[in-house]
């Protein structure tokens, strides 16, 4: 299936039922302080609570994902960066992102999920190259799921 690109907000798309699953990249430090992570924390607080709780338990591992099933669908926190910080530094680990995407494929394979991702997933705050990230998404999930990239 081709990936669709559209103007809009990925969090709104999940809340409004336009997609069933929202993917985003996050760090392994228990912080959701900027970008779409902060919006998820503020608008879908139970997704943040799962992430925070797992961090407090010491069970957040890079290359793994945390899935939160809530009233509006699934938020998938793909832990693909060890840290965060200054601009123009690559924090995302492409191998770990690919590992997370493969896990998402396994979790989603039994359903006909519509997946939403933010434009520049793992590329804006995480410092990755959007074209590389998009190729990973297309290669791992693109032929199996209806995927929409939301750009504000």
Where are the predicted features?
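Macrodomain-like recognition of ADP-ribose-binding/processing modules
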Residues: 1-152
